[in-house]
């Protein structure tokens, strides 16, 4: 069994050693829930990595969005280069679920675009969980959505071993049942080809490796791993395990049984609709379902097959669907990062999904069993989750209730940096005072972050600052992905000194050069000025030893009082620790994770073309397809050097697309 081996130039410092020991003690004493309260810059990810390495148990880390998940995945890959670090998020670049708007009698067909790179990584994640124990899967909250049954997925694997006998026709039939496609011309992921006594398989979990099976009669003589682009042999294998090309691979006998059960439900539903005199709904449901049944009978699949998942996975009505949690070993660990956001997301997903599907069922577009194709209910997630560590700088009520209000704190930063000084000033003439504070901060060579309440305020303030000849820019949801990253890069490099935004809590805004965070209209209670939001925003100034925060308010709200009091409490603890140990706070110049994506974008793309591609998923997909086609053409012409260059460009573009998704 492989053990986790953490590789880092740093050792746990500050509060980290104590926090690691406390969490591990809790895990060993069978505590089901623990709370790790880690402030900005305290090294939460490094602490998680050390806990995982010492416990040596398979781990799932849940994040509340793809960007944060990609950041954690990247950091874990660096710290655990010898272990299986996997990424599991929704594989849709674009997803429009089917829906019916009764008021206008409008039916919206399901439409989606699948990201092949993410699909590959999802397959790699489930394969690792089934094959080994030194696995860390970093996932978004989408891991609570239905996935194929792990029992069927594992049951249908094809195990290959050198020296054993495999009847050729049966092996090819097994590959087709795993939803691999025979393609003797275009050899891509999820395909196989036959050449003489050789069968080449391009596994679903690889992008740059394939397997060549060399037979003598029915005996498998060799298994070689090779580069599918150049044909170069990479390794000789004794064994290989071929997993399905889809997580929804199903044995034919299961499909046949499901068809019978669907027919029974259909007849019951049609009788009910007829009794309610719903003629249109009756005809619609019968026509749509009969078509799906015909497709299932002839091909083993149909469009929207997931709506019949209850029958295909052998579940009873109302039972939870199989999800990634069923792929986890019983002794797995779960970290819920930024739990104050992630937990409410988990709670909300089921209700939103059910409301949409209920309308489809009522109007004859789907059978009632389609309601069981859903994410986990919060109560089900509670039941399935293994020993859990919630991680946040601002724990939510659920986490505090689960842990009895007991938290393990990460307050002392390894760098010695203090929480910023908080100053409260009147909101009257706040812009005039802000200009004065900006001048003082910029004179020190530092940057300024300003948070407003609306997009218009952010844009108007930026325009005003630019009229005063300040190098400033604004950031909000209407700013496209690449432009956003370029603004952050310009801020880091000093091309601009001031960034104005609405919600400065998003990943990527930990700016070490930030000397001032100004919160305008801090006394306007609401989502953007709640205690949690204020603490998180104040944390933006905690990366610099000279960081300050000014809250412009005409009255002290409960949120301001609690946020400032908590910040001052932490600051005092940090000061006392530094004085006791003779530590001088030091600003750490850390690379912003999201900016590394800019370096991976094809250098041949000019700025305008890059913006067009990354702001339009369809055009980006078309460009990636064009590069793939050129790469394969170069390989078929034996121009392997050119093919390799194109493959590197393609890889950089796909990685950048993944990080910017």
From Swiss-Prot:
GO molecular function: ATP binding; ATP hydrolysis activity; DNA binding; excinuclease ABC activity; helicase activity
Cellular location(s): Cytoplasm
Biological-process GO terms, alphabetical: nucleotide-excision repair; SOS response
Positions of ATP binding: 38-45
Beta-hairpin (motif): residue ranges: 91-114
Intrachain disulfide bonds: none
Domain of life where this protein originates: Bacteria
Keyword field: ATP-binding, Cytoplasm, DNA damage, DNA excision, DNA repair, Excision nuclease, Helicase, Hydrolase, Nucleotide-binding, SOS response
GO cellular component: cytoplasm; excinuclease repair complex
Record SMART domains: DEXDc (SM00487), HELICc (SM00490)
Domain Helicase C-terminal intervals: 430-592
SUPFAM superfamilies: C-terminal UvrC-binding domain of UvrB, P-loop containing nucleoside triphosphate hydrolases
Segments forming domain Helicase ATP-binding: 25-182
PROSITE patterns in the cross-refs: HELICASE_ATP_BIND_1 (PS51192), HELICASE_CTER (PS51194), UVR (PS50151)
Pfam families from the UniProt entry: Helicase_C, ResIII, UVR, UvrB, UvrB_inter
Function: The UvrABC repair system catalyzes the recognition and processing of DNA lesions. A damage recognition complex composed of 2 UvrA and 2 UvrB subunits scans DNA for abnormalities. Upon binding of the UvrA(2)B(2) complex to a putative damaged site, the DNA wraps around one UvrB monomer. DNA wrap is dependent on ATP binding by UvrB and probably causes local melting of the DNA helix, facilitating insertion of UvrB beta-hairpin between the DNA strands. Then UvrB probes one DNA strand for the presence of a lesion.
Similarity comment: family membership: Belongs to the UvrB family.
HAMAP family registered for this protein in UniProt: UvrB
Free-text note on domains in this protein's UniProt record: The beta-hairpin motif is involved in DNA binding.
NCBIfam families: PRK05298.1, uvrb
PANTHER family: UVRABC SYSTEM PROTEIN B
Identification of the protein by name: UvrABC system protein B
Taxonomic source organism: Rickettsia canadensis (strain McKiel)
């Amino acid at each position: 069994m492989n053990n986790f081996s953490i590789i880092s130039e740093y050792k746990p410092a500050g509060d980290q050693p104590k926090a690691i020991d406390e969490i591990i003690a809790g895990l060993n004493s069978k505590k089901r829930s623990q709370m790790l309260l880690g402030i900005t810059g305290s090294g939460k990810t490094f602490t998680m990595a050390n806990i995982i390495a010492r416990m040596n148990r398979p781990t799932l880390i849940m994040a509340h969005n793809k960007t944060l998940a990609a950041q954690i995945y990247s950091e874990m890959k660096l710290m655990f280069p010898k272990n299986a670090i996997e990424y599991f998020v929704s594989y849709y670049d674009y997803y429009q679920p089917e829906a019916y708007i009764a008021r206008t009698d409008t039916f919206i067909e399901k439409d989606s675009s699948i990201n092949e790179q993410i699909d590959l990584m999802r397959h790699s994640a489930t394969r690792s969980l089934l094959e080994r124990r030194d696995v860390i899967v970093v996932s978004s909250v989408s891991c609570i959505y239905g996935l194929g049954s792990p029992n069927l997925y594992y049951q249908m694997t094809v195990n290959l071993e050198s020296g054993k006998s495999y009847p050729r026709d049966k092996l090819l039939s097994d590959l087709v049942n795993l939803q691999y496609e025979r393609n003797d011309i275009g050899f891509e992921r999820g395909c196989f080809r036959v050449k003489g006594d050789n069968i080449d398989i391009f596994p679903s979990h690889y992008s740059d490796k394939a397997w060549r099976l060399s037979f003598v009669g029915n005996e498998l003589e060799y298994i070689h791993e090779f580069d599918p682009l150049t044909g170069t042999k990479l390794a000789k294998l004794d064994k290989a395990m071929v997993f399905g090309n889809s997580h929804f691979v199903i044995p034919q006998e299961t499909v046949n049984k499901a068809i019978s059960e669907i027919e029974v439900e259909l007849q019951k539903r049609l009788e009910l609709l007829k009794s309610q005199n719903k003629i249109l709904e009756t005809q619609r449901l019968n026509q749509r379902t009969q078509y799906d049944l015909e497709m299932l009978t002839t091909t083993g699949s149909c469009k929207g097959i997931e709506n019949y998942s209850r029958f295909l996975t052998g579940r009873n009505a109302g039972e939870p669907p199989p999800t990634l949690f069923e792929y986890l070993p019983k002794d797995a660990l779960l970290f819920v990062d930024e739990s104050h956001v992630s937990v409410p997301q988990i709670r909300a997903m089921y209700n939103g999904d059910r409301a949409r599907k209920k309308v489809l069922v009522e109007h004859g577009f789907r059978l009632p069993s389609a309601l069981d194709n859903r994410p986990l209910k919060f109560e089900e997630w509670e039941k399935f989750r293994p020993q859990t560590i919630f991680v946040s700088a601002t724990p939510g009520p659920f986490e505090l209730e689960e842990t009895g209000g007991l938290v393990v704190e990460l307050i002392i930063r390894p760098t010695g940096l203090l929480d910023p000084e908080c100053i409260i000033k009147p909101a009257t003439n706040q812009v005039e005072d802000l200009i004065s504070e900006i001048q003082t901060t910029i004179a020190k060579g530092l940057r300024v972050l300003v948070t407003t309440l609306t997009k218009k305020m952010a844009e108007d303030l930026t325009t005003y600052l630019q009229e005063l000849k300040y190098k400033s820019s604004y950031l909000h949801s209407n700013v496209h992905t690449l432009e956003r990253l370029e603004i952050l890069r310009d801020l880091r490099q000093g091309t601009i000194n001031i960034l104005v935004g609405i919600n400065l809590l998003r990943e990527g805004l930990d700016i070490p050069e930030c000397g001032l965070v100004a919160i305008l209209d801090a006394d306007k209670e609401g989502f953007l000025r709640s205690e949690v939001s204020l603490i998180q925003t104040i944390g933006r100034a905690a990366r610099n030893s000279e960081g300050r925060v000014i809250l412009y308010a005409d009255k002290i709200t409960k949120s301001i009082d609690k946020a400032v009091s908590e910040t001052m409490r932490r600051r005092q603890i940090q000061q006392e620790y530094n004085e006791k140990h003779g530590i001088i706070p030091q600003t750490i110049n850390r690379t912003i994770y999201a900016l590394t994506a800019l370096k991976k974008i094809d250098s041949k793309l000019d700025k305008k073309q890059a913006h067009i591609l990354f702001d339009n998923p369809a055009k980006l997909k078309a460009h990636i397809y064009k590069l793939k086609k050129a790469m394969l053409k170069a390989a078929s012409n034996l121009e392997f050097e050119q093919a390799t260059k194109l493959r590197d460009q393609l890889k950089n573009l796909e990685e950048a697309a993944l990080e910017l998704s």
